Curated annotation (Swiss-Prot):
Function as written in the Swiss-Prot or TrEMBL entry: Transfers a GMP moiety from GTP to Mo-molybdopterin (Mo-MPT) cofactor (Moco or molybdenum cofactor) to form Mo-molybdopterin guanine dinucleotide (Mo-MGD) cofactor.
This protein's name: Probable molybdenum cofactor guanylyltransferase
Listed PANTHER family: MOLYBDENUM COFACTOR GUANYLYLTRANSFERASE
Enzyme class: transferase
Domain notes for this protein: The N-terminal domain determines nucleotide recognition and specific binding, while the C-terminal domain determines the specific binding to the target protein.
HAMAP family: MobA
GO cellular component: cytoplasm
Predominant subcellular localization, coarse grouping: cytoplasm
Residues at which Mg(2+) binds: D103
Gene Ontology biological-process entries: Mo-molybdopterin cofactor biosynthetic process
Domain of life: Bacteria
Example GO molecular function: GTP binding
Amino acid sequence: MCKEIEGQKLFGSAIILAGGRSSRMGFDKQFIEINEKRLIEITAGRLAQIFDEIIIVTNRPEMHSCCQYKLTSDIIKGKGPLGGIHAGLLAAESEFVFAIACDMPYINLDYIEHMKCVVESSIKAGEDIDACITLKGEWIEPFNAFYRKSLVKSIEEHLESDKRAVYSLLKQLNTTYISEFEARRFSPDWSMFFNMNTMEELRQYSQVTQEEKPNGKVEIL
């Protein structure tokens, strides 16, 4: 595990983007339950092993009233994932903030620690880094990634110009990319980037969960 650079709180905050239209799934994915516990809370608990601050970005905070984690909502409404990242960065305390979506059930802590090391190495080398992103071929993986808190202004300007794509923003930034080859050393099947968009994908994940825990079940609220 990498150590923090002296005098700087580089890491410590993680944001989970919850909700969205979920048109292909047919319901709000932030309310999926696995083994009688919300998937988003399972994700938060896993991340809490290596982060001091967990922030859930949700458009329905009243549905998380019993949640032990910090809640926030989009400041700039209706802008998709980038609006959620913006809200999470505003609420976060650390300089670099880990971001993941609520429908990504496979949390790879070893890879997160590896990304921290990549960020630290870049800083120690004197590089100005705004984000640490994984590539799959020529495509980017915008989640399971780190973003710098100071990007808030850049994101606001990007959204104000009616641009919502994370990729178009990253092209303007000092982005450090991790290759697919390197990332697959930690997740050969790419499961750490798997997200559930359809009922079939939910059933597949349910089946895996039930195989791991015979009494496992998936519930949709």
